[in-house]
Amino acid sequence: MAALVREVVGDVLRGARMSQGRTLREVSDSARVSLGYLSEIERGRKEPSSELLSAICTALQLPLSVVLIDAGERMARQERLARATPAGRATGATIDASTKVVIAPVVSLAVA
């Protein structure tokens, strides 16, 4: 199943906050949003309004366009992967008779 926009945006926001070494409290105070609500946004449970998303981006000193572009690129990668993966089969999760496995040749065997 494809990721929801709110989940991907939340991942981008959390990644930005963590890369800055900032806490939820710091960003929530700066953006004037409750810590719990910001946490839910980051976890993809809540979808922020455009105004709130802008406030969070301002608190992170990150242009809104950067967040949206990053989220769009992540979603595009997921969509390409989903199209490339045969229906009903998780990527790399199963091996069947049609799976080709390359085994490197053994140069020598040690005898104990």
UniProtKB/Swiss-Prot annotation:
InterPro entries: ClgR-like (IPR049655), Cro/C1-type_HTH (IPR001387), Lambda_DNA-bd_dom_sf (IPR010982). One of its GO terms (biological process) is biological process involved in interaction with host. Disruption phenotype: Inactivation of the gene increases M.tuberculosis susceptibility to the intramacrophage environment. Deletion mutant shows a significantly reduced ability to arrest the acidification of the phagosome. Residues 24-43 bind DNA. SMART domains: HTH_XRE (SM00530). PROSITE patterns: HTH_CROC1. Residues 13-67 form the HTH cro/C1-type domain. Gene3D superfamilies: lambda repressor-like DNA-binding domains. One of its GO terms (molecular function) is sequence-specific DNA binding. Induction: Expression requires SigE. Induced by carbonyl cyanide m-chlorophenyl hydrazone (CCCP). Induced in response to thioridazine (THZ). Keywords: DNA-binding, Stress response, Transcription, Transcription regulation. It comes from the Bacteria. Interacts with PspA. Key stress-response regulator that plays an important role in multiple regulatory networks in response to different stress conditions. Involved in preservation of envelope integrity and tolerance to surface stress. Essential for macrophage infection and facilitates intracellular growth of M.tuberculosis. Controls the expression of several protease and chaperone systems, including clpP1, clpP2, clpC1, ptrB, Rv1043c, acr2, clpB, Rv3269 and the clgR-pspA-rv2743c-rv2742c region. This is Transcriptional regulator ClgR. It comes from Mycobacterium tuberculosis (strain ATCC 25618 / H37Rv). The gene is clgR.
